[in-house]
Amino acid sequence: LAFATGAVRTLATVDVALAEGAGTSARFTVDLSTLDAATHLLLISCHAAAAPHVPLSLNEELLAPPGDLHLPTATVGAAVADQANRDGTVNVTVRSSSTALYVTLTTRAHGHFSDNAFAMPPGERQLTFVPLGTPDLRGLAASLRVEHLQPYLSHPPAAHADSSAPAASAA
């Protein structure tokens, strides 16, 4: 995932055959030399051969410590649906103006989100809030908070993630 654009490209596809059961693994290597660790996130997805477009798992791996990342400024927000779904869950739409990492949603409403602390390219993503008990739409919407990594970094946000020019400073 390129921070500047949100573009995703495939670096490698590896076919593996694993035995059934827990504790099975396969090792392989992927050439990461074409990536700048400060401007990219490695997305690792696992798919079954019978359903290649349905991920079984998705892992997001930083290639550099968070403090070394050059993330763009991102405005991230979320909106709660006006009504609960038939099963009692509530749709939450998350929007980001730029790539954002560790997008985290919190609320005082009792329950959990279908995903949290995730990487998000620019655009929109639908999550589900799973309440404990009766959904409290008003409480969920009123207390919903969305945070992400970039505002907590100590250096200025990257204007262009591929820029090698030093940042100007005022004296």
What do these predicted ranges mean?
Residues L1-L42, H110-L137:
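Intrinsically disordered, low-complexity Pro/Gly/Ser/Thr-rich segments with frequent PxxP/GP/PP motifs
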Residues T10-A12, P55-L63:
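Extracellular and select intracellular beta-sandwich modules with Ser/Thr-enriched
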Residues D36-P55, D136-P157:
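Short, aromatic- and glycine-rich surface loops/edge beta-strands on solvent-exposed regions
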Residues L62-R86:
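Low-complexity, acidic Ser/Thr/Pro/Gly-rich terminal tails and inter-domain linkers that flank the onset
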Residues G88-V92:
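Structural beta-strand segments of beta-rich domains
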Residues T93-S98:
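Asparagine-centered strand-capping/turn motif at beta-strand->loop junctions
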Residues A100-T107:
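Short, hydrophobic/aromatic beta-strand segments
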Residues H160-P166:
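Mature N-terminal, pre-catalytic/accessory segment of carbohydrate-active enzymes
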